Amino acid sequence: MASLAAALAPPPPVRIGYVTDVEGNLDYFRRYVRASGVLRFDDDAETVLRFADDGCRFVFGGDAVDKGDGDVRLCRMLADLSDRYGRDRVALLVGNRDLNKLRFTAELSPEALATPPEAVPGPHWDDAAPRLADYLKSKSLDDSRANRLRWMLEHTLGCPGTFEFRRAELKKLRNEDDVTDDDVVDSCVGEVLPGGALRAYLERASVAARFGSTLFVHGAVDAQTAGFVPDKNTRFRVGRHGDAGFPPTKSFMGERDVDAWVRDLNALLAWGLEDHLARPTFAADGSRGGDCLLALQNRCAVWGRSVVSNCYADGGNVDSRSAKTRRARIWAAVREGASTGAYDARAFEASTKYTSDARDPAVHAWLRRSGVKRVVVGHRPVGDSPALLRAATGGVEVVMADTSFADVAAPDKRGASLVVATFEGDDVERTATRIVGSRADGASYEVRVPAPGDDADADDVLGTVDADGWWCKARCEDGFLFSRGDGRKVEYDLRP
């Protein structure tokens, strides 16, 4: 753990604070701010943010909403911070939970509500999800805007608690107890339209952001996403032959370097938001404004090329043996499809448990050619402390910091866990990784890794894996924390 001298030393000139996947949990975000050393609250009510000093930058890694009663207030805070300090110091990333709310304007429109429940399709990426008609029948519910929204949240958006979380937040914002179902629906739809806090967040956000040698995205930079930008005409549906991302075996790394890729992804976001405003409801052919952004966060719509929703982590770590086996099996089927034309765009969906290869040397080489030495992501939970891949010679460091399922027994699924990630140094091009926080049981941990390529003293075991598949995640009071697992099952071992 850090020495007293280190704790008392002045902060480095450059500090990039990072937090991700807060998902409307305002209490968690406030805990982060108080501990960050990068952000501070400017008011007693803790609603206005400011930087600790002029050397600070901040990245919010996406997924601002869904699983707490602070969606609106968190988005307002983050948008306000961006307005006051600018995008050269504040980067807000889009996550799947942020982008997929653009669906509300079309799917809850009067025209859509006129469609009989029996004719409303289920989510194209999940055949197991109940259709709207079956949902209403199973719960003896009438066909209303509110109940359609409840079905969407529970079975197509993965956030069954959001309806009541929003009701609770509206009560706080309005200082009144009488918040109707229609009020909740109006709020959810209104939040993605001008004047809405989520809309403000999206308009100030990026798909990818770069500070010096560190690249930030929500999901993953892998062999499928690197260099790929969806076409503006990409539809939110199962991918088809002839789509820009077809075939899935094609590499796009030769088409753009990292900076051009970041620029074009962010230009697509800006265009897609304008398109959503211009065409917020369904057209006769089933398309809608912002289709390309809904596709961007939906793996099968872009043939497994979603930089927003692809993910590395498995079993709480960078990778696992079972993940490698699944990845090899899925790719064998994909390559077989190359000879027969029998591709399945859903081969890379979360339902197949597919995860990307964070150690792909071709991707690392592509990143390094543009000067990127570190990739930082969220999206996929990694237990109760971040997962780390150390940069081997010629490689890239990867940090994964979503701990939103740190304590599944806790009401908020986080418990006492906290992640405070900072990338710091004398120069934005050469920053070290420093992560401090607490595990689900409240025990503290620390991760200190020098800038990639730096020979400074460090715990060389951090971010490495042993022969039995145990990854070293952090230094704790009594030794090193190791973990291994499969899927979302994680086991831990504390070693001296």
Regions found by a protein language model. Name each.
Residues A2-P496:
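Feature recognizes metal-dependent phosphohydrolase scaffolds
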